[in-house]
Amino acid sequence: MDDKASVGKISVSSDSVSTLNSEDFVLVSRQGDETPSTNNGSDDEKTGLKIVGNGSEQQLQKELADVLMDPPMDDQPGEKELVKRSQLDGEGDGPLSNQLSASSTINPVPLVGLQKPEMSLPVKPGQGDSEASSPFTPVADEDSVVFSKLTYLGCASVNAPRSEVEALRMMSILRSQCQISLDVTLSVPNVSEGIVRLLDPQTNTEIANYPIYKILFCVRGHDGTPESDCFAFTESHYNAELFRIHVFRCEIQEAVSRILYSFATAFRRSAKQTPLSATAAPQTPDSDIFTFSVSLEIKEDDGKGYFSAVPKDKDRQCFKLRQGIDKKIVIYVQQTTNKELAIERCFGLLLSPGKDVRNSDMHLLDLESMGKSSDGKSYVITGSWNPKSPHFQVVNEETPKDKVLFMTTAVDLVITEVQEPVRFLLETKVRVCSPNERLFWPFSKRSTTENFFLKLKQIKQRERKNNTDTLYEVVCLESESERERRKTTASPSVRLPQSGSQSSVIPSPPEDDEEEDNDEPLLSGSGDVSKECAEKILETWGELLSKWHLNLNVRPKQLSSLVRNGVPEALRGEVWQLLAGCHNNDHLVEKYRILITKESPQDSAITRDINRTFPAHDYFKDTGGDGQDSLYKICKAYSVYDEEIGYCQGQSFLAAVLLLHMPEEQAFSVLVKIMFDYGLRELFKQNFEDLHCKFYQLERLMQEYIPDLYNHFLDISLEAHMYASQWFLTLFTAKFPLYMVFHIIDLLLCEGISVIFNVALGLLKTSKDDLLLTDFEGALKFFRVQLPKRYRSEENAKKLMELACNMKISQKKLKKYEKEYHTMREQQAQQEDPIERFERENRRLQEANMRLEQENDDLAHELVTSKIALRKDLDNAEEKADALNKELLMTKQKLIDAEEEKRRLEEESAQLKEMCRRELDKAESEIKKNSSIIGDYKQICSQLSERLEKQQTANKVEIEKIRQKVDDCERCREFFNKEGRVKGISSTKEVLDEDTDEEKETLKNQLREMELELAQTKLQLVEAECKIQDLEHHLGLALNEVQAAKKTWFNRTLSSIKTATGVQGKETC
């Protein structure tokens, strides 16, 4: 980590981090017991939070060095504040109390740099609070590590906040039941006084925050389980008995260990103000210096499946990168002096564009490998770098030939015998070129090396936790370049401000000393402009605008004096339009709406410049954002509107300044006024002839106002066009801070384009002493880098504008210089030898001819290449046409065959229909015949049954009569008993039996004949059913053929036949 604070160490095997309970991470207060608790959470008394003074808030406040109090929570009444303390190990200054931010619904977020606004947290009144407890005011730029590509899975209440089993169980439940995952960015502070923040990845706004001292336990999912890419932490809520667990999932699984390590670091470290001393710490007997040689190598995809080292420019000492090509970062770490220290692992490889970047601006790269080299002398770390990521857009755009970019690479190493991780920071220069550019210049070595001096202090035996713990702690870490810079800064030749003295002239900015060797120019669009203004000034401007609106054609008298002090930011949009005379610009507004619909011939140049316009301003830095879209429309509309000039490089800066104060239509109108009415477009005409006249006027003014600087520029052959071109063409809008740019535009719109001379002379006059000490290269570098940085202080910019306004440069004098220039040009033309002129013209024409020939060759080559490509495409198209023709013929033949098959199937279908009709009619007739036969037999049977019943009844009646007659006869009565049975005479009985048997036999014969006829009828019915089955079989075969022909109507007909046949068959049964 960096030098500002120290960090703790976490074991590789550790899956969880707890502020009070972990074998790898036990935090002990200096006031507490020196023997840390090592239980695993089974004993509540040992793992509970210990509060000084037995829980008394007053006693706790007296013990605390810094107190964090909860702000009032109006939206969550009834929840109480929980103030407990962690017990910090060794380095902590004491226990810390904390606040919990209220968040009922958390919207998770991925990781970008967090810039924390300066704020003061009010003290929440409570019982026992005393006046001695002051609120904690966080630092404006909180030192933190930001992690992106995280997903928030949710939170839940837990009863055992330090139980790893409970935490893993809740992690599994939330991961499996999560239906709506939310992307978040997590910011983890580097000190225990900090706050963990959840940020929105799009707007970078804070969603929720959790103070470190409220976080009780951290845990990650076990390897080999679905939760291996998840981690969680528990925090105490407002009620002392309420604990919540928050679960997150990482898109990059390796980042889980890095996040847990950041939490462990925050638990260990106290926010001590330990800036790096300007002088090295004195050598003590118990300290040692270890020297490390760290080399950086960048590799690019060579298109053949391998990565090759990128070249390094021998003169500029910068890497040359190709745009949009995948890269790898390779770091070689080798210890060169002192006792060898064992590097355990690398837990972070980070990269960021720029120089002197903050920790929160560094972006984590994916680690591919780490370990000892083949010879065992160095430790090698390799990481993959995707340059197309939005974070690295600055180092993925083509760099102008005269510029270089800075890039910062950091590697975090865990050294076995060192208590804290060590961060080696490498700042290198890079240039980005086209992906198709060939590398043709000679190169030196393809890596850059920096020596680092790590000063360690051995920890005393009694301060260690055990015998196997770390042996050293970091005192300071310094690179060789920092040492050289410090020596240069402290040398007597460098002018340092005397203590206690304050100069009235514009002082050198305080950052000049530390950025003297910084070759990176100030980004355009930098500098915050405040809209605050004194009430008296606003009242004065309000009265002036009221009078002005009464007559817009006449400017108020006091306008010039007010503009010289600067127009209030809130009024600039309106005042600029009035100064430019755009109060009647309806025709330009309508014209603009038409122009943006037309095509511009300079579209590519506009698009290229827009990406470079105000990259430091939030409104324009997003590619494809609203700011760049509006800026593109304005530049495109003007290029179509002014066909003679079109779009010229630098116009986008002026358009961006206007766009920051007014809508697109009004900004376009003011831009047109500045270009035409103020004469800015004249500078671009006639091969920049008027611009060269301005350069001559500036040099003549320098000769009059700053003669010594003018003579110095003559001595070093520095001409005005070498440093002032951008001043005139962009009106100082390209490089200087915005508050200074806006003030210059105020003066320009009020007094005209001659204001440029006032500002230019002011810049030269205030920088005269520095410029007199420079040579040609140094002067150019000063104008490009140091000069804009001098005015990052708004006070310096105001003094410069006061100086510029006080300079009296009359128009008469400028006219005089203009005449001198034209006279000089005429004299040069007259005095010039015609032969020399013709030779120069001849050389120019030859160069133009060579250029045209080269262009012709290029076009011819492109034409040949295009013809070859077109011939190849034509051959491919012809082959494809032949194949399609063959396929068409085959398809046509298949269609003819299919039509013939269709006709054949239709004929067969008609025959089947006819056969089905015949068989159906025959079956119906058979069924009717069988039905009539069955009905006749049923009728006969019923008649016979009736006849039998009648005969039986008659027989019974006759028998009864005979019985009565016998009863009446005295002789016959003896032959019968009381039941009517014959007593004795067997012959009579036999006769009667014979008569009865004959009658029965007759009936049986008749019944047998009827049964035989019935059996014959059933046999005929069975034969009819067999025939029906045969018909159904034939119908089934026909059905298959019909189905093949996809005749669905035939299926319905056949089904109706089956249904009818089946119903009638059941009736016959």
From Swiss-Prot:
One of its GO terms (biological process) is regulation of GTPase activity. Residues 510-520 have a biased composition (Acidic residues). GO terms for molecular function: GTPase activator activity; small GTPase binding; tubulin binding. The modification Phosphothreonine is found at T996. CDD domains: PTB_Rab6GAP (cd01211). The arginine and glutamine fingers are critical for the GTPase-activating mechanism, they pull out Rab's 'switch 2' glutamine and insert in Rab's active site. May act as a GTPase-activating protein of RAB6A. May play a role in microtubule nucleation by centrosome. May participate in a RAB6A-mediated pathway involved in the metaphase-anaphase transition. This is Rab GTPase-activating protein 1. It comes from Homo sapiens (Human).
